[in-house]
Amino acid sequence: MATITFDSLNPVTVAISAGFLLLLIIFVKSRTGSSKRKPPGPPGWPIFGNMFDLGDLPHQTLYKLKSKYGPIVWLQLGSINTMVVQNAVSAAELFKKHDVPFCDRKVPDTLTAFNFNQGSLGMNTYGGHWRVLRRLCSMEFLVNKRMNETTDLRRRIEDNMVRWIEEDSLASKAQGGTGAVQLSRFLFLMAFNLVGNLMLSRDLMDNKDPEGREFFDCMNEILELAGTPNIADFLPLLKKLDPLGMKKRMVDNMSRTMKISSKFVQERLDNRKAGKINEKKDFLDVMLEYQGDGKDGPDKFTEQHVNIVIMEMFFAGSETTSISIEWGFTELLRNPHAFKKVREEIDRVVGVNRMVEETDMENLPYLQAVVKETLRLHPALPMLLPRNTMEDTEYMGYLIPKGTQVFVNAWAIGRDPEYWQDPLSFKPERFINSSVEYKGQHFELIPFGSGRRICVGFPLAHRVVHLTLATLVQAFDWDLGAGVKPQDIDLEERLGLTLRKKNPLNVIPKKRVHI
Protein backbone atom coordinates (compact mmCIF):
# COMPACT_ATOMS: atom_id res chain seq x y z
CA MET A 1 0.00 0.00 0.00
CA ALA A 2 1.46 3.34 -1.07
CA THR A 3 2.24 5.85 1.63
CA ILE A 4 1.29 9.47 0.98
CA THR A 5 3.88 11.83 2.37
CA PHE A 6 3.72 15.61 2.51
CA ASP A 7 6.70 15.75 0.15
CA SER A 8 4.80 13.77 -2.48
CA LEU A 9 2.01 16.31 -2.72
CA ASN A 10 1.97 18.98 -5.40
CA PRO A 11 2.50 22.42 -3.77
CA VAL A 12 -0.49 23.80 -5.67
CA THR A 13 -2.68 20.98 -4.32
CA VAL A 14 -1.49 21.71 -0.81
CA ALA A 15 -2.19 25.42 -1.20
CA ILE A 16 -5.68 24.84 -2.58
CA SER A 17 -6.48 22.28 0.11
CA ALA A 18 -5.27 24.62 2.85
CA GLY A 19 -7.30 27.44 1.36
CA PHE A 20 -10.47 25.37 1.30
CA LEU A 21 -9.85 24.20 4.86
CA LEU A 22 -9.53 27.81 5.98
CA LEU A 23 -12.72 28.74 4.12
CA LEU A 24 -14.51 25.81 5.75
CA ILE A 25 -13.43 27.01 9.19
CA ILE A 26 -14.67 30.52 8.38
CA PHE A 27 -17.98 29.12 7.14
CA VAL A 28 -18.51 27.00 10.26
CA LYS A 29 -17.68 29.93 12.52
CA SER A 30 -20.12 32.14 10.61
CA ARG A 31 -22.88 29.58 11.24
CA THR A 32 -22.28 29.40 14.99
CA GLY A 33 -21.99 31.87 17.83
CA SER A 34 -24.63 34.60 17.60
CA SER A 35 -26.61 32.89 14.81
CA LYS A 36 -29.73 32.79 16.99
CA ARG A 37 -29.85 36.57 16.81
CA LYS A 38 -29.34 36.79 13.07
CA PRO A 39 -32.33 37.11 10.71
CA PRO A 40 -33.74 33.90 9.21
CA GLY A 41 -32.57 32.68 5.83
CA PRO A 42 -32.09 29.61 3.64
CA PRO A 43 -29.44 27.03 4.57
CA GLY A 44 -26.28 27.14 2.50
CA TRP A 45 -23.56 24.83 1.24
CA PRO A 46 -20.24 24.46 3.06
CA ILE A 47 -17.75 27.13 1.96
CA PHE A 48 -19.99 28.54 -0.77
CA GLY A 49 -23.07 29.23 1.33
CA ASN A 50 -25.92 30.60 -0.80
CA MET A 51 -23.68 31.74 -3.67
CA PHE A 52 -25.33 29.47 -6.22
CA ASP A 53 -28.89 29.67 -4.88
CA LEU A 54 -29.93 33.10 -6.16
CA GLY A 55 -29.77 32.61 -9.93
CA ASP A 56 -29.29 35.29 -12.58
CA LEU A 57 -32.02 37.52 -11.13
CA PRO A 58 -31.37 37.52 -7.36
CA HIS A 59 -33.88 40.31 -6.67
CA GLN A 60 -36.65 38.05 -7.99
CA THR A 61 -35.42 34.99 -6.08
CA LEU A 62 -35.25 36.98 -2.85
CA TYR A 63 -38.71 38.41 -3.47
CA LYS A 64 -40.06 34.85 -3.51
CA LEU A 65 -38.13 33.95 -0.33
CA LYS A 66 -39.91 36.71 1.58
CA SER A 67 -43.05 34.59 2.03
CA LYS A 68 -40.98 31.93 3.83
CA TYR A 69 -38.41 33.94 5.76
CA GLY A 70 -40.06 37.32 6.22
CA PRO A 71 -38.99 40.84 5.20
CA ILE A 72 -35.38 40.49 6.41
CA VAL A 73 -33.41 37.61 4.90
CA TRP A 74 -29.96 36.41 5.98
CA LEU A 75 -27.59 34.90 3.41
CA GLN A 76 -24.08 33.51 3.50
CA LEU A 77 -22.44 34.40 0.18
CA GLY A 78 -19.17 32.53 0.42
CA SER A 79 -17.55 33.99 3.51
CA ILE A 80 -19.56 37.23 3.31
CA ASN A 81 -22.39 37.80 5.79
CA THR A 82 -25.28 39.34 3.86
CA MET A 83 -28.61 40.82 4.94
CA VAL A 84 -31.42 41.71 2.53
CA VAL A 85 -34.19 44.16 3.51
CA GLN A 86 -37.45 43.61 1.60
CA ASN A 87 -40.30 45.74 2.93
CA ALA A 88 -41.02 49.39 3.66
CA VAL A 89 -41.10 49.03 7.46
CA SER A 90 -37.66 47.43 7.69
CA ALA A 91 -36.28 49.89 5.11
CA ALA A 92 -37.60 52.83 7.15
CA GLU A 93 -36.00 51.37 10.28
CA LEU A 94 -32.67 51.05 8.48
CA PHE A 95 -32.61 54.49 6.85
CA LYS A 96 -34.16 56.50 9.69
CA LYS A 97 -32.67 54.89 12.81
CA HIS A 98 -29.51 53.09 11.64
CA ASP A 99 -28.35 55.09 8.64
CA VAL A 100 -24.87 55.88 10.00
CA PRO A 101 -23.76 52.36 11.05
CA PHE A 102 -25.06 51.03 7.70
CA CYS A 103 -23.57 53.92 5.69
CA ASP A 104 -20.35 52.32 4.45
CA ARG A 105 -20.00 50.49 1.13
CA LYS A 106 -19.18 46.90 0.28
CA VAL A 107 -16.94 47.32 -2.77
CA PRO A 108 -16.63 44.76 -5.62
CA ASP A 109 -13.01 43.79 -6.25
CA THR A 110 -13.08 45.10 -9.83
CA LEU A 111 -13.89 48.59 -8.55
CA THR A 112 -10.73 48.69 -6.45
CA ALA A 113 -8.70 48.99 -9.66
CA PHE A 114 -6.69 52.23 -9.57
CA ASN A 115 -8.22 52.72 -6.09
CA PHE A 116 -11.40 53.72 -7.91
CA ASN A 117 -13.51 53.23 -4.79
CA GLN A 118 -11.33 55.66 -2.79
CA GLY A 119 -12.00 58.50 -5.23
CA SER A 120 -15.59 57.59 -6.06
CA LEU A 121 -18.73 59.19 -4.70
CA GLY A 122 -20.92 56.11 -4.96
CA MET A 123 -18.43 53.49 -3.68
CA ASN A 124 -16.26 55.56 -1.33
CA THR A 125 -15.88 54.81 2.36
CA TYR A 126 -18.14 56.96 4.50
CA GLY A 127 -15.88 59.81 5.58
CA GLY A 128 -14.37 63.20 4.75
CA HIS A 129 -13.57 62.62 1.07
CA TRP A 130 -17.07 61.30 0.44
CA ARG A 131 -18.65 64.27 2.26
CA VAL A 132 -16.69 66.78 0.15
CA LEU A 133 -17.70 65.11 -3.13
CA ARG A 134 -21.30 64.87 -2.00
CA ARG A 135 -21.36 68.53 -1.05
CA LEU A 136 -19.83 69.63 -4.35
CA CYS A 137 -22.32 67.58 -6.36
CA SER A 138 -25.40 68.67 -4.44
CA MET A 139 -24.51 72.33 -3.85
CA GLU A 140 -22.33 73.26 -6.83
CA PHE A 141 -23.46 70.97 -9.62
CA LEU A 142 -26.95 69.55 -9.12
CA VAL A 143 -28.56 72.40 -7.21
CA ASN A 144 -31.71 73.76 -8.91
CA LYS A 145 -30.04 77.03 -9.93
CA ARG A 146 -27.28 75.20 -11.79
CA MET A 147 -29.69 72.79 -13.45
CA ASN A 148 -31.96 75.63 -14.55
CA GLU A 149 -28.97 77.21 -16.29
CA THR A 150 -28.55 74.08 -18.43
CA THR A 151 -32.21 73.65 -19.43
CA ASP A 152 -31.55 74.74 -23.04
CA LEU A 153 -28.60 72.35 -23.23
CA ARG A 154 -30.79 69.39 -22.34
CA ARG A 155 -33.41 70.40 -24.91
CA ARG A 156 -30.68 70.60 -27.59
CA ILE A 157 -29.40 67.14 -26.74
CA GLU A 158 -32.96 65.76 -26.84
CA ASP A 159 -33.41 67.32 -30.28
CA ASN A 160 -30.20 65.64 -31.43
CA MET A 161 -31.58 62.31 -30.22
CA VAL A 162 -34.80 62.84 -32.21
CA ARG A 163 -32.72 63.58 -35.30
CA TRP A 164 -30.54 60.48 -34.81
CA ILE A 165 -33.60 58.25 -34.43
CA GLU A 166 -35.19 59.64 -37.59
CA GLU A 167 -31.96 59.36 -39.61
CA ASP A 168 -31.32 55.78 -38.47
CA SER A 169 -34.85 54.72 -39.39
CA LEU A 170 -34.62 56.32 -42.82
CA ALA A 171 -31.23 54.66 -43.43
CA SER A 172 -32.75 51.29 -42.54
CA LYS A 173 -35.58 51.79 -45.02
CA ALA A 174 -33.15 52.92 -47.73
CA GLN A 175 -31.35 49.58 -47.34
CA GLY A 176 -34.58 47.61 -47.64
CA GLY A 177 -35.21 47.27 -43.91
CA THR A 178 -38.33 47.99 -41.91
CA GLY A 179 -37.06 51.24 -40.44
CA ALA A 180 -36.96 49.77 -36.92
CA VAL A 181 -34.51 51.32 -34.47
CA GLN A 182 -33.03 49.90 -31.27
CA LEU A 183 -34.18 52.61 -28.91
CA SER A 184 -31.79 51.80 -26.05
CA ARG A 185 -28.79 52.78 -28.18
CA PHE A 186 -30.08 56.30 -28.77
CA LEU A 187 -31.16 56.75 -25.17
CA PHE A 188 -27.68 55.82 -23.97
CA LEU A 189 -26.01 58.12 -26.50
CA MET A 190 -28.29 60.98 -25.46
CA ALA A 191 -27.51 60.45 -21.77
CA PHE A 192 -23.79 60.03 -22.49
CA ASN A 193 -23.63 63.32 -24.38
CA LEU A 194 -25.62 65.03 -21.65
CA VAL A 195 -23.12 63.96 -18.99
CA GLY A 196 -20.28 64.96 -21.34
CA ASN A 197 -21.63 68.48 -21.56
CA LEU A 198 -22.34 68.82 -17.85
CA MET A 199 -18.93 67.42 -16.89
CA LEU A 200 -16.69 68.61 -19.72
CA SER A 201 -18.74 71.02 -21.87
CA ARG A 202 -18.37 68.83 -24.96
CA ASP A 203 -20.32 66.36 -27.10
CA LEU A 204 -18.29 63.18 -26.73
CA MET A 205 -20.30 61.34 -29.37
CA ASP A 206 -19.54 63.85 -32.10
CA ASN A 207 -18.27 62.15 -35.27
CA LYS A 208 -15.34 64.57 -35.23
CA ASP A 209 -14.18 63.37 -31.80
CA PRO A 210 -12.54 59.91 -32.12
CA GLU A 211 -11.30 60.08 -28.52
CA GLY A 212 -14.89 60.50 -27.42
CA ARG A 213 -15.84 57.29 -29.21
CA GLU A 214 -12.94 55.38 -27.65
CA PHE A 215 -13.96 56.75 -24.25
CA PHE A 216 -17.51 55.55 -24.94
CA ASP A 217 -16.32 52.03 -25.85
CA CYS A 218 -14.14 51.78 -22.73
CA MET A 219 -17.00 52.93 -20.53
CA ASN A 220 -19.22 50.19 -21.95
CA GLU A 221 -16.56 47.60 -21.08
CA ILE A 222 -16.25 48.99 -17.55
CA LEU A 223 -20.02 48.80 -17.12
CA GLU A 224 -20.06 45.15 -18.20
CA LEU A 225 -17.20 44.20 -15.88
CA ALA A 226 -18.64 46.07 -12.90
CA GLY A 227 -21.92 44.19 -13.30
CA THR A 228 -20.47 40.69 -13.80
CA PRO A 229 -20.48 38.39 -10.72
CA ASN A 230 -16.95 37.71 -9.48
CA ILE A 231 -16.13 34.75 -7.23
CA ALA A 232 -13.37 36.83 -5.61
CA ASP A 233 -16.05 39.05 -4.06
CA PHE A 234 -17.48 36.09 -2.14
CA LEU A 235 -14.23 34.28 -1.34
CA PRO A 236 -11.81 37.15 -0.59
CA LEU A 237 -8.85 34.77 -0.25
CA LEU A 238 -9.00 34.48 -4.05
CA LYS A 239 -8.68 38.21 -4.71
CA LYS A 240 -4.92 38.16 -5.24
CA LEU A 241 -5.28 35.28 -7.69
CA ASP A 242 -7.95 37.11 -9.75
CA PRO A 243 -9.20 33.68 -10.93
CA LEU A 244 -11.55 35.04 -13.62
CA GLY A 245 -9.12 37.74 -14.80
CA MET A 246 -11.75 40.40 -14.18
CA LYS A 247 -9.55 42.73 -12.14
CA LYS A 248 -6.91 42.69 -14.90
CA ARG A 249 -9.49 43.51 -17.57
CA MET A 250 -10.85 46.33 -15.43
CA VAL A 251 -7.34 47.75 -14.94
CA ASP A 252 -6.79 47.66 -18.71
CA ASN A 253 -10.04 49.48 -19.48
CA MET A 254 -9.69 52.02 -16.69
CA SER A 255 -6.14 52.73 -17.83
CA ARG A 256 -7.33 53.53 -21.35
CA THR A 257 -10.20 55.62 -20.01
CA MET A 258 -7.97 57.59 -17.65
CA LYS A 259 -5.52 58.39 -20.44
CA ILE A 260 -8.35 59.94 -22.44
CA SER A 261 -9.90 61.81 -19.51
CA SER A 262 -6.42 63.07 -18.53
CA LYS A 263 -6.21 64.71 -21.95
CA PHE A 264 -9.55 66.42 -21.34
CA VAL A 265 -8.32 67.65 -17.95
CA GLN A 266 -4.97 68.85 -19.30
CA GLU A 267 -6.70 70.66 -22.16
CA ARG A 268 -8.85 72.50 -19.61
CA LEU A 269 -5.82 73.38 -17.47
CA ASP A 270 -3.99 74.73 -20.53
CA ASN A 271 -7.01 76.83 -21.49
CA ARG A 272 -7.27 78.24 -17.98
CA LYS A 273 -3.58 79.19 -18.00
CA ALA A 274 -4.14 80.92 -21.32
CA GLY A 275 -7.03 82.90 -19.83
CA LYS A 276 -9.73 80.94 -21.66
CA ILE A 277 -12.30 80.48 -18.91
CA ASN A 278 -15.72 78.90 -19.48
CA GLU A 279 -18.50 81.45 -19.20
CA LYS A 280 -20.59 78.79 -17.45
CA LYS A 281 -18.76 76.43 -15.13
CA ASP A 282 -19.05 72.70 -15.63
CA PHE A 283 -18.23 70.10 -12.98
CA LEU A 284 -14.62 69.84 -14.12
CA ASP A 285 -14.20 73.55 -13.33
CA VAL A 286 -15.78 73.00 -9.92
CA MET A 287 -13.35 70.20 -9.08
CA LEU A 288 -10.27 72.03 -10.36
CA GLU A 289 -11.14 75.14 -8.36
CA TYR A 290 -11.90 73.32 -5.12
CA GLN A 291 -9.83 74.39 -2.12
CA GLY A 292 -10.48 72.51 1.12
CA ASP A 293 -10.15 73.85 4.64
CA GLY A 294 -7.97 70.99 5.82
CA LYS A 295 -10.58 69.90 8.36
CA ASP A 296 -12.73 67.47 6.40
CA GLY A 297 -11.59 65.77 3.24
CA PRO A 298 -8.77 66.71 0.85
CA ASP A 299 -7.37 70.22 0.44
CA LYS A 300 -7.60 69.71 -3.32
CA PHE A 301 -8.35 66.93 -5.76
CA THR A 302 -5.53 65.06 -7.46
CA GLU A 303 -5.67 64.36 -11.18
CA GLN A 304 -6.54 60.74 -10.40
CA HIS A 305 -9.44 61.84 -8.19
CA VAL A 306 -10.74 64.04 -11.01
CA ASN A 307 -10.44 61.21 -13.55
CA ILE A 308 -12.26 58.79 -11.25
CA VAL A 309 -15.16 61.19 -10.74
CA ILE A 310 -15.38 61.80 -14.50
CA MET A 311 -15.60 58.04 -15.12
CA GLU A 312 -18.15 57.55 -12.37
CA MET A 313 -20.43 60.33 -13.56
CA PHE A 314 -20.48 58.84 -17.05
CA PHE A 315 -21.39 55.29 -16.13
CA ALA A 316 -23.72 56.29 -13.29
CA GLY A 317 -25.51 59.06 -15.16
CA SER A 318 -25.71 57.44 -18.60
CA GLU A 319 -26.62 53.87 -17.70
CA THR A 320 -29.27 54.34 -15.02
CA THR A 321 -31.06 57.20 -16.76
CA SER A 322 -31.26 55.57 -20.19
CA ILE A 323 -32.46 52.27 -18.71
CA SER A 324 -35.26 53.97 -16.75
CA ILE A 325 -36.44 55.71 -19.92
CA GLU A 326 -36.44 52.47 -21.93
CA TRP A 327 -38.50 50.69 -19.27
CA GLY A 328 -40.94 53.59 -19.11
CA PHE A 329 -41.39 53.73 -22.87
CA THR A 330 -41.75 49.95 -23.03
CA GLU A 331 -44.62 50.12 -20.54
CA LEU A 332 -46.29 52.91 -22.52
CA LEU A 333 -46.16 50.85 -25.72
CA ARG A 334 -47.50 47.78 -23.89
CA ASN A 335 -50.34 49.88 -22.47
CA PRO A 336 -51.79 51.95 -25.35
CA HIS A 337 -54.39 53.59 -23.09
CA ALA A 338 -51.56 55.06 -20.98
CA PHE A 339 -49.66 56.18 -24.10
CA LYS A 340 -52.82 57.88 -25.37
CA LYS A 341 -53.33 59.71 -22.08
CA VAL A 342 -49.74 61.01 -22.10
CA ARG A 343 -50.07 62.09 -25.75
CA GLU A 344 -53.37 63.89 -25.14
CA GLU A 345 -51.98 65.62 -22.05
CA ILE A 346 -48.90 66.86 -23.93
CA ASP A 347 -50.95 68.03 -26.93
CA ARG A 348 -53.33 69.89 -24.63
CA VAL A 349 -50.60 71.62 -22.61
CA VAL A 350 -47.85 72.04 -25.22
CA GLY A 351 -49.53 71.76 -28.62
CA VAL A 352 -47.74 70.68 -31.80
CA ASN A 353 -46.02 73.94 -32.71
CA ARG A 354 -43.14 73.58 -30.26
CA MET A 355 -41.33 70.80 -28.45
CA VAL A 356 -42.12 70.02 -24.84
CA GLU A 357 -39.91 71.81 -22.29
CA GLU A 358 -38.91 71.08 -18.71
CA THR A 359 -41.07 73.99 -17.57
CA ASP A 360 -44.13 72.11 -18.89
CA MET A 361 -43.66 69.17 -16.53
CA GLU A 362 -45.55 70.65 -13.58
CA ASN A 363 -48.62 70.79 -15.86
CA LEU A 364 -48.31 67.14 -16.95
CA PRO A 365 -49.52 65.15 -13.91
CA TYR A 366 -50.25 61.96 -15.82
CA LEU A 367 -46.71 61.91 -17.24
CA GLN A 368 -45.41 62.34 -13.68
CA ALA A 369 -47.53 59.36 -12.61
CA VAL A 370 -46.11 57.29 -15.49
CA VAL A 371 -42.56 58.00 -14.30
CA LYS A 372 -43.40 57.03 -10.71
CA GLU A 373 -45.07 53.81 -11.85
CA THR A 374 -42.06 52.99 -14.04
CA LEU A 375 -39.63 53.47 -11.16
CA ARG A 376 -41.87 51.41 -8.86
CA LEU A 377 -41.82 48.40 -11.19
CA HIS A 378 -38.39 48.82 -12.79
CA PRO A 379 -35.79 50.44 -10.49
CA ALA A 380 -32.50 50.67 -12.39
CA LEU A 381 -30.65 49.33 -9.33
CA PRO A 382 -33.09 46.69 -8.06
CA MET A 383 -31.20 46.13 -4.80
CA LEU A 384 -29.59 49.59 -4.71
CA LEU A 385 -25.82 49.66 -4.04
CA PRO A 386 -24.47 47.29 -1.37
CA ARG A 387 -23.91 48.80 2.06
CA ASN A 388 -21.49 47.60 4.72
CA THR A 389 -22.01 47.72 8.48
CA MET A 390 -19.32 49.73 10.25
CA GLU A 391 -20.01 48.23 13.69
CA ASP A 392 -22.06 45.53 15.39
CA THR A 393 -25.62 46.88 15.26
CA GLU A 394 -28.92 45.99 16.91
CA TYR A 395 -31.51 46.14 14.14
CA MET A 396 -35.15 44.99 14.23
CA GLY A 397 -34.37 42.64 17.15
CA TYR A 398 -31.34 41.09 15.44
CA LEU A 399 -27.61 41.52 16.00
CA ILE A 400 -25.98 42.43 12.69
CA PRO A 401 -22.20 41.90 12.87
CA LYS A 402 -19.68 44.47 11.71
CA GLY A 403 -18.69 43.92 8.08
CA THR A 404 -22.09 42.58 7.00
CA GLN A 405 -23.08 43.33 3.41
CA VAL A 406 -26.55 44.91 3.28
CA PHE A 407 -28.90 45.07 0.30
CA VAL A 408 -32.26 46.83 0.13
CA ASN A 409 -34.48 45.08 -2.42
CA ALA A 410 -36.22 48.15 -3.88
CA TRP A 411 -37.65 45.93 -6.64
CA ALA A 412 -39.44 43.74 -4.08
CA ILE A 413 -40.59 46.72 -2.01
CA GLY A 414 -42.16 48.29 -5.10
CA ARG A 415 -44.18 45.10 -5.69
CA ASP A 416 -45.24 44.47 -2.10
CA PRO A 417 -49.00 43.68 -2.01
CA GLU A 418 -49.16 45.06 1.54
CA TYR A 419 -48.64 48.54 0.09
CA TRP A 420 -49.70 48.31 -3.55
CA GLN A 421 -53.04 47.15 -4.90
CA ASP A 422 -52.59 44.88 -7.95
CA PRO A 423 -48.81 45.41 -7.59
CA LEU A 424 -47.68 43.66 -10.78
CA SER A 425 -49.86 45.78 -13.09
CA PHE A 426 -48.77 49.04 -14.72
CA LYS A 427 -51.31 51.57 -13.42
CA PRO A 428 -50.07 55.17 -13.37
CA GLU A 429 -53.50 56.22 -12.09
CA ARG A 430 -52.51 54.94 -8.62
CA PHE A 431 -50.30 58.04 -8.27
CA ILE A 432 -52.90 60.61 -9.32
CA ASN A 433 -53.78 62.67 -6.22
CA SER A 434 -51.19 60.66 -4.26
CA SER A 435 -48.53 62.30 -2.10
CA VAL A 436 -46.06 59.42 -2.55
CA GLU A 437 -42.73 60.55 -4.03
CA TYR A 438 -39.39 58.84 -4.72
CA LYS A 439 -37.21 61.35 -2.86
CA GLY A 440 -36.37 58.93 -0.06
CA GLN A 441 -39.10 59.84 2.43
CA HIS A 442 -41.74 57.33 1.34
CA PHE A 443 -40.15 53.95 1.94
CA GLU A 444 -42.60 52.00 -0.21
CA LEU A 445 -40.99 53.73 -3.23
CA ILE A 446 -37.20 54.07 -3.00
CA PRO A 447 -35.68 53.52 -6.47
CA PHE A 448 -32.93 56.05 -5.61
CA GLY A 449 -32.41 54.85 -2.05
CA SER A 450 -32.72 57.01 1.05
CA GLY A 451 -30.68 58.51 3.85
CA ARG A 452 -27.19 59.95 3.57
CA ARG A 453 -26.31 57.81 0.58
CA ILE A 454 -29.40 58.45 -1.50
CA CYS A 455 -28.44 58.79 -5.18
CA VAL A 456 -27.02 62.30 -5.48
CA GLY A 457 -27.99 62.48 -9.16
CA PHE A 458 -31.71 61.85 -8.76
CA PRO A 459 -32.75 65.53 -9.26
CA LEU A 460 -31.09 65.47 -12.70
CA ALA A 461 -32.44 62.00 -13.52
CA HIS A 462 -35.91 63.22 -12.55
CA ARG A 463 -35.73 66.00 -15.14
CA VAL A 464 -34.18 63.92 -17.92
CA VAL A 465 -36.52 60.92 -17.60
CA HIS A 466 -39.62 63.14 -17.74
CA LEU A 467 -38.32 65.24 -20.64
CA THR A 468 -37.18 62.27 -22.73
CA LEU A 469 -40.38 60.25 -22.31
CA ALA A 470 -42.43 63.32 -23.22
CA THR A 471 -40.21 63.97 -26.26
CA LEU A 472 -40.55 60.40 -27.56
CA VAL A 473 -44.34 60.49 -27.19
CA GLN A 474 -44.67 63.93 -28.77
CA ALA A 475 -42.17 63.65 -31.62
CA PHE A 476 -43.09 60.29 -33.15
CA ASP A 477 -45.84 57.82 -33.85
CA TRP A 478 -44.54 54.31 -33.16
CA ASP A 479 -45.16 51.07 -35.06
CA LEU A 480 -44.36 47.77 -33.35
CA GLY A 481 -43.82 45.94 -36.63
CA ALA A 482 -45.86 43.48 -38.66
CA GLY A 483 -48.04 41.25 -36.53
CA VAL A 484 -46.69 42.51 -33.20
CA LYS A 485 -49.32 43.45 -30.63
CA PRO A 486 -48.70 45.56 -27.50
CA GLN A 487 -49.06 42.52 -25.23
CA ASP A 488 -46.33 40.76 -27.25
CA ILE A 489 -43.69 43.17 -25.95
CA ASP A 490 -41.83 41.26 -23.26
CA LEU A 491 -40.64 42.51 -19.88
CA GLU A 492 -37.83 40.00 -19.39
CA GLU A 493 -34.94 41.32 -17.33
CA ARG A 494 -31.16 41.03 -17.50
CA LEU A 495 -29.17 42.02 -14.44
CA GLY A 496 -25.68 43.45 -14.72
CA LEU A 497 -24.61 46.57 -12.91
CA THR A 498 -28.17 47.72 -13.60
CA LEU A 499 -31.48 46.05 -14.48
CA ARG A 500 -31.80 46.16 -18.26
CA LYS A 501 -34.36 44.76 -20.65
CA LYS A 502 -33.14 41.33 -21.72
CA ASN A 503 -34.41 41.97 -25.25
CA PRO A 504 -33.88 45.59 -26.33
CA LEU A 505 -36.91 47.46 -27.61
CA ASN A 506 -37.00 47.64 -31.43
CA VAL A 507 -39.69 49.92 -32.85
CA ILE A 508 -40.44 51.87 -36.03
CA PRO A 509 -40.69 55.66 -35.62
CA LYS A 510 -42.70 57.98 -37.85
CA LYS A 511 -41.99 61.67 -37.34
CA ARG A 512 -45.07 63.44 -36.01
CA VAL A 513 -43.93 66.92 -34.94
CA HIS A 514 -41.79 68.72 -37.52
CA ILE A 515 -40.03 71.53 -35.68
Swiss-Prot record:
GO terms for cellular component: endoplasmic reticulum; endoplasmic reticulum membrane. The keyword Metal-binding applies. The chain crosses the membrane at residues 8-28, 180-200. GO terms for molecular function: heme binding; iron ion binding; monooxygenase activity; oxidoreductase activity, acting on paired donors, with incorporation or reduction of molecular oxygen. InterPro entries: Cyt_P450, Cyt_P450_CS, Cyt_P450_E_grp-I, Cyt_P450_sf. Its EC number is 1.14.14.161. Induction: By jasmonic acid (MeJA). Heme binds at residue 455. Expressed in the leaf internal phloem-associated parenchyma (IPAP) inside the mesophyll. It catalyses: (+)-cis-trans-nepetalactol + 3 reduced [NADPH--hemoprotein reductase] + 3 O2 = 7-deoxyloganetate + 3 oxidized [NADPH--hemoprotein reductase] + 4 H2O + 4 H(+). Pathway: Alkaloid biosynthesis. It comes from the Eukaryota. It is found in: Endoplasmic reticulum membrane. Disulfide bonds: none annotated. GO terms for biological process: indole alkaloid metabolic process; response to jasmonic acid. It is a multi-pass membrane protein. PANTHER family: CYTOCHROME P450 (PTHR47950:SF15), CYTOCHROME P450, FAMILY 76, SUBFAMILY C, POLYPEPTIDE 5-RELATED (PTHR47950). Component of the seco-iridoid and derivatives monoterpenoid indole alkaloids (MIAs, e.g. vincristine, quinine, and strychnine) biosynthesis pathway. Catalyzes the conversion of cis-trans-nepetalactol (iridodial) into 7-deoxyloganetic acid. Also converts iridotrial into 7-deoxyloganetic acid. Belongs to the cytochrome P450 family. This is Iridoid oxidase. It comes from Catharanthus roseus.
